[in-house]
Curated annotation (Swiss-Prot):
DNA binds at R48, R76, E164, G237, D239. Its cofactor is Mg(2+). Interacts with PCNA. Three molecules of FEN1 bind to one PCNA trimer with each molecule binding to one PCNA monomer. PCNA stimulates the nuclease activity without altering cleavage specificity. This is Flap endonuclease 1. It is an enzyme of class 3 (hydrolase). Residues 128-259 are annotated as: I-domain. The lineage of its organism: Eukaryota, Sar, Stramenopiles, Oomycota, Peronosporales. The keyword Repressor does not apply. It comes from Phytophthora infestans (strain T30-4) (Potato late blight agent). One of its GO terms (biological process) is base-excision repair.
Amino acid sequence: MGIKGLMKLLQEEAPSCIKEVEKMSALAGHAVAIDASMALYQFLIAIRSADGGGPSQALTNADGEVTSHLQGMFSRTIRMMENGLKPVYVFDGKPPVMKSGELAKRSDRRQEAQKALEEATEKGNAEDIDRFNKRLVRATPQHNEDCKELLRLMGVPHITAPCEAEASCAALAKGGRVYAAGTEDMDALTFGVPVLYRRLTVSPAKKIPILEIRLERALQELEMTHEQFVDLCILCGCDYCDSIRGVGPKKAYAGIKEHKSIENFLEVLQKNKSKGVVIPDEWLGENPIYKNAREMFIKPEVVDAKETEIKWRDPQETELVDFLVKKHGFQEDRVLSAITRLKKSKSTQSQKRLDSFFTVMPSANGAKKRKAPAAKGGKKAATAKKGKK
């Protein structure tokens, strides 16, 4: 889920923290920790085929095994490396106990989608079948293992986080091992990543720019410390606890900006008995849940940035061909062509970063505030939220 409404809030209240990167090559030379679970979900959703105008299905080999995740990981990783990026994939570890409630909700939503899919199939509505099929997509442990093996053979480093992938992405960036994190999850900022890239793994056919979001600039414009920003994110709505009914991102922002903490803001809400505001019982008492959520963001379980090995190696060509062609049914000529591109990309990775490709978001509210435009392509351009873990 990430943080509800945070992107829109930043576009309105801290627009200068967001930049559009029109060309991926502008990021050349940077190592980026990529949320692998999010990327896998994107590939499973986006890389599909439709026969005869019917509903789309994930790509499969002759044995009926899904290969969308491998196709996406292979092609998009090579594209990043050809543009000079140095990707480091970070996979999810065990889900935190506090996320059990959110995971249960996702399970319920999948059950609802399954029922809706059955009804749509009965009616033969291809559009609805496609829509509900995508809601049922999730990356399996086997998908993860397939991609880890693929990355190993490509010579691309990958890490399995002890817990949340985006938290370890942030830790690697804060520890100076990578420049930024690449994920659609806005809670990477809550975990403290200095620079966040969104849309890195989106298909180039969509022709939408990468978004760069800088945390320090966001905090400056919001006039908040990172601790206050964490409280804001919890109030907006996160994976670790239910939010307060009647308190959306704007009210949360105003509340934290004025009262500096959730504790102080809650005291005011209770005192004023604000209309339409319902504070969950778990937010009250001696051990309110928001304190545990705060701890999850400020002291997450992450990889040791200093001790983690990150090394890019030469691809193992023969083994890579065997894995993709013989085991997973890829076309050999295409795989060989892609391997040639992969090998050539090694020289590109040392290319200097080209700041001239950056485009500052346009002004909206004069000198004080510059409002960022809505995402191109509307909802279809925005990357779907994962059904991970």
